[in-house]
Amino acid sequence: MYFKRKEIEKFSSFKGPLIDVRSPGEYYKGHMPNSINIPLFDNDERSIIGTIYKKEGRKKAVIEGLKFFEKKMELLLDNLFMSIDSYKTIPNKNNEFFIRIYCSRGGMRSQSIAWLLDKYKLNPITLKGGYKIYRRWVLDSFSKKLNIVVIGGKTGTGKTRLLSLLEKYKYQTIDLEGFACHRGSTFGGLGMKEQPSNEQFENKIAEKLYSFKISNSIFVEAESANIGKCKIPHEFFNQMKNSRRIEIIRSESNRLDELIDTYSVFKKEELQESVLRIKKRLGPQRTKIALESINNERWDLVCKSVLDYYDKCYEYEKVGKTNIKILDLTDKKYDESILELVNNVL
């Protein structure tokens, strides 16, 4: 056989370019993280082939697909070679370099590209079962028993910064807000990239879990079930709810400093739009104060005007939570806070 087909974990363990040959639409919905999309067929071509398959059968659909393939073979090769050349490879144990290719189900699309690359002695491998089997692997990963430690605390207690430092010091962390490109509040999308699809959000979490030693502690920030439009996988979220929880406490002054540092860099118009989205919950007086304070760059008043609202929301979400340990980090620097946090967990 001119190419090798690998099971998902074996496929993922090899080093080399990771090529997704599905259509751009399929790729946008969800893909293996760090993969490059070099589609065998664009969205329209895939639709045409699919229609022929339904109306006239597999044979005619394959013939039509081969026509598209023949016309763009040179362009495909150029794109493939460009991706391969730009990839900084790390040899595997056998010093072999593989081009990893996958399509929807491990069928003709990935096989066709593998055949093409094999002609140039480029050692392609394909994913057995394709992206469909990968998604099954992703969803299965959330049912594993995990040693999660949830970092909780009111808005402005520096939870995200603590999580970032934990990762810097090589502790196992999952930045759910980073993966979701959203901070989880009405201001959460400010300065962030477009949110990924929920499918892609799940893929990122699963890949991170795969890199961990499951028996060791995994730190995550306390979140609602939804982060913007991204929904935390149900089984993973249930484990978060039943895990150990460290509740960070800081003074109001500390919290205001943190919020001012985070949000004062954004455009006034963006901040005002965010305030208006929760005006019914803030009430007319606090909304007016917040909007005027943004206009006058009184960031302390802006943050104070919304802090009470978020504190009430947080207390409501915390109802029924057990296994909570309080950690007062008022006036402590973040490096010092990390040591205290780790000493209280590990």
Please tell me what each predicted stretch does.
Residues 118-135, 175-180:
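A short glycine-rich beta-strand->turn/loop micro-motif centered on a GG-aromatic cluster
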Residues 108-109, 147-168:
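Glycine-rich phosphate-binding P-loop
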Residues 1-33, 61, 139-143, 148-154:
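Flexible, polar/low-complexity N-terminal or interdomain linker segments that lie immediately upstream
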Residues 18-22, 35-38, 174-175, 219:
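Short hydrophobic beta-strand that contains or immediately precedes a catalytic carboxylate
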Residues 66-127:
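Catalytic cysteine-centered active loop of the rhodanese-like fold, especially the PTP/DSP P-loop
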Residues 239-245, 249-346:
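Conserved NTP phosphate-binding and transfer environment spanning the P-loop NTPase/kinase superfamily
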Residues 168-238:
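Conserved nucleotide-sensing/catalytic segment adjacent to the nucleotide-binding pocket
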Residues 28-78:
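Glycine/alanine-rich phosphate-binding loops at beta-alpha junctions
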